[in-house]
């Protein structure tokens, strides 16, 4: 029994070293979410799968169409992180501001419900080589207006992004986004 408890503690500690989600700050008009994760693959591979295979790892529950395979990221300045909808509709989630493959990807815009709030945000992915692969740092800084204050949205945004980045990690390492 004691060895099972020790094993459970070790698993939790190891998982904590892999995913470090944090609401870095929040206030009435905005928040910043930061996630740091180790991924066992080269930065170029992580970047490529993030950009070119977004529909394979993004959670379909966080799409307007209900199908993540309708998502795409155009790898160019002013490129679109877009989603196709039925009946020739579309959603422009974010715009590519800056990319250096295997090093950084920065998008501008508002995800999901933040679009209707007139919010503006920057979502930055930084890829740093480390001995066992890549340290991926994700920062989402958002400003906007909500009657209850934007701080109340920080934890849900953190949860959604942590889910997405965990799915990316799983996809890169195993070929499957969900474990």
Describe the role of every protein-language-model region:
Residues 1-5:
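Positively charged n-region of N-terminal signal peptides that target proteins for export
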Residues 7-17:
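Bacterial N-terminal signal peptides
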Residues 18-68:
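Hydrophobic ligand-binding cavity/cleft-lining segments
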Residues 35-37, 92-98, 121-129:
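Hydrophobic/aromatic beta-strand elements that line small-molecule binding cavities or substrate pockets
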Residues 46-50, 81, 96, 107, ...:
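Hydrophobic pocket/interface hotspot
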Residues 54-91:
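Short beta-edge strand/loop motif at the mouth of beta-sheet-based domains
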Residues 112-162:
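Beta-strand/loop substructures that line and gate deep hydrophobic ligand-binding cavities in soluble
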Residues 170-179:
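Short, highly charged C-terminal tails/helix-capping segments
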């Amino acid at each position: 029994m004691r060895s099972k408890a020790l094993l459970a503690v070790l698993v939790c500690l190891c998982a904590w070293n892999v995913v470090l989600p944090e609401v870095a700050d929040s206030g009435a008009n905005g928040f910043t979410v930061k996630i740091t994760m180790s991924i066992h693959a080269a930065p170029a591979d992580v970047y490529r799968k993030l950009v070119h295979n977004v529909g394979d790892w993004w959670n379909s529950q966080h799409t307007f169409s209900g199908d993540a395979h309708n998502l795409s990221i155009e790898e160019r300045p002013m490129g679109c992180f877009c989603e196709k909808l039925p009946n020739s509709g579309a959603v422009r989630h974010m715009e590519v501001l800056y990319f250096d493959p295997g090093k950084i990807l920065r998008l501008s815009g508002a995800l999901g419900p933040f679009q209707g709030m007139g919010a503006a945000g920057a979502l930055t992915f930084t890829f740093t080589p480390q001995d066992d692969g890549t340290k991926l740092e994700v920062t989402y800084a958002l400003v906007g207006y909500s009657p209850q204050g934007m701080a109340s949205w920080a934890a849900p945004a953190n949860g959604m992004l942590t889910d997405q980045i965990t799915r990316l990690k799983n996809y890169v390492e195993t070929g499957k986004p969900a474990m």
